């Protein structure tokens, strides 16, 4: 399968990566940073550590459960599928990435076995994820495309649509070449959070947020704004509790999130295979910057 990615040759200039100024901080000065982003194929020679760190961020407290090195190697073993986003050229670390892994094709690999078992177990604990739990329990497992994507916390959502658009093209070309990427479903692994009373005596600073009720009058916020759109197209979606818990209010030097008085949770979104393209179009419109 030949790579036919062109967007990496066209820089996209975006600014305003900080959060909006709220009423109680009107006297603060907002910094606007203009950055040119470039899209690249995954590069086995340079992207291993950057992708592994982003995977650790994605799986949060439960990242220790998985062999992230093996998972990173699996992502890099299909360099013609998926994208990274960088700002300092191809040899620099990725600021964002997106890829898809075939759970059926890789079912015998230990890291995929662990992931599939984990996802099935978590889905079975949330009634809203019952359709996903049933799919993951089938033997053999259906050709589910596991979408893994993460980015640095202040990366603008505008980098997302090009990654998904290129992924759809690459999947179509792979299917033409009779490669195993004809997915029945797509499963997006992501993260949400809830605000909790912070035990830290410091000024609160939240990530940009999109609200969604999750029951019991608790607001659920999206780290990835596009997830709100994907959930509208989903067969099912819902939050999952991490196996390993963060202490309330714990300051974690590797995750600024814990300094902000928030509780993070995993998020799973199951989309019917043929419906992903329409979902991506809606995401493109949703994150489009105002004219």
UniProtKB/Swiss-Prot annotation:
Kindly indicate whether the keyword Aminoacyl-tRNA synthetase belongs to this entry. Answer: no
**What's a Pfam family in this record?**
BCCIP
UniProt feature, compositional bias: Basic and acidic residues: 1-11
Q: Where does this one sit in the cell? A: Cytoplasm; Nucleus
Single GO biological process annotation from the record = protein transport
* GO annotation, cellular component aspect: cytoplasm; nucleus
UniProt function note: Involved in nuclear export, actin cytoskeleton organization and vesicular transport.
Q: Which family does the record assign?
A: Belongs to the BCP1 family.
What's this protein's name?
A: Protein bcp1
Organism listed in the record: Aspergillus fumigatus (strain ATCC MYA-4609 / CBS 101355 / FGSC A1100 / Af293) (Neosartorya fumigata)
């Amino acid at each position: 399968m030949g790579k036919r990615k062109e967007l990496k040759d066209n820089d996209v200039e975006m600014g305003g990566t900080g959060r909006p100024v709220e009423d109680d901080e009107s006297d603060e000065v907002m910094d606007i940073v203009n950055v040119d982003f470039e899209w690249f194929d995954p590069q086995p020679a340079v992207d291993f550590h950057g992708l592994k760190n982003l995977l650790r961020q994605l799986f949060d407290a439960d990242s220790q459960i998985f062999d992230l090195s093996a998972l990173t190697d699996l992502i890099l073993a299909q360099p013609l599928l998926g994208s990274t986003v960088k700002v300092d050229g191809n040899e620099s670390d990725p600021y964002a990435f997106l890829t898809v892994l075939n759970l059926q094709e890789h079912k015998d690999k230990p890291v995929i076995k662990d992931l599939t078992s984990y996802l099935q177990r978590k889905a079975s604990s949330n009634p809203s994820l019952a359709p996903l739990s049933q799919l993951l329990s089938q033997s053999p497992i259906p050709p589910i495309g596991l979408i893994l994507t993460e980015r640095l916390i202040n990366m603008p959502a505008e980098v997302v649509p090009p990654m998904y658009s290129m992924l759809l093209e690459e999947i179509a070309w792979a299917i033409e070449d009779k490669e195993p990427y004809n997915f029945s479903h797509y499963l997006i692994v992501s993260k949400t959070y809830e605000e909790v009373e912070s035990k830290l005596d410091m000024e609160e600073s939240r990530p940009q947020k999109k609200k969604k009720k999750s029951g019991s009058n608790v607001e659920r916020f999206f780290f990835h704004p596009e997830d709100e759109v994907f959930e509208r197209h989903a067969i099912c979606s819902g939050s999952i509790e991490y196996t390993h818990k963060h202490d309330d209010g714990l300051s974690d030097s590797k995750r600024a999130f814990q300094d902000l008085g928030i509780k993070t949770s995993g998020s799973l979104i199951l989309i019917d295979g043929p419906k992903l393209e329409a979902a991506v179009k809606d995401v493109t419109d949703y994150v489009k910057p105002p004219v």
